[in-house]
């Protein structure tokens, strides 16, 4: 059953009716991208794969406190350094967090192959026989393509309606795995064809859900004030997966109004540092926003564009900004920021950007 949002006024109803015209973010029937969150590792049951001493690990294991909106390290905002680390699979597979992720996703790959080729009987026997026919090799965990081989969106699990922001999302560099305090959006879907079955490993069966640009349009919309306003009507202490999946987002793709406007600004906010040099090149050499003032202005522009993408008029936009919950000592959500957001909304109405 869908969650009915907590509404307090007729204006709330009018705003939400406009926002609900868009499809749920997890709806795969819509063209382009979609978002499927999941917990990659668990702090309790997978603790044997974590170490606390960075010198004993090869890569960080991120949790919710290691990211903020458009931030994957403390360069611009005070976030914690990683608490845990782990080792590569070829160093010690029995201690590797990446190996544990691979083990967990093996069944998903097997099931996808079984259904894609109209399997009957035992999944194990059918898939192994299918692959033996095509490549003389049964399915193995090494056929799993890890999500951490690609840049991907993550968002904090712990969230409250009375926090400064309810949704806190970032794109993180590749090579990092995450605990359940940081939900991840799958960057790949499994869509095999017969030609793929000759490959070892089976990486060609994986296709990216997001293009480079749509990854950042999705990030921009997730971190926008309109989406936050929607989510805080149904959040208590955590971002429950099904509540996130049913929430509506404009599914902007290349050629849509506001697509270029939003992805460019989200990318400039997020793609800083050496870890994002490759992504900056893939996006055509974008310049990351480096100063606090510049980042605030770009985020206000992004918020303004998101109001338009949702189809919210000026009165509705003003209502959301006036009604948005403010904490006592905000990082960014100040009266001045809300005024700047409305100013940017008006500038866009006049064709200024």
What is each stretch, according to the model?
Residues 1-353:
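S-adenosyl-L-methionine
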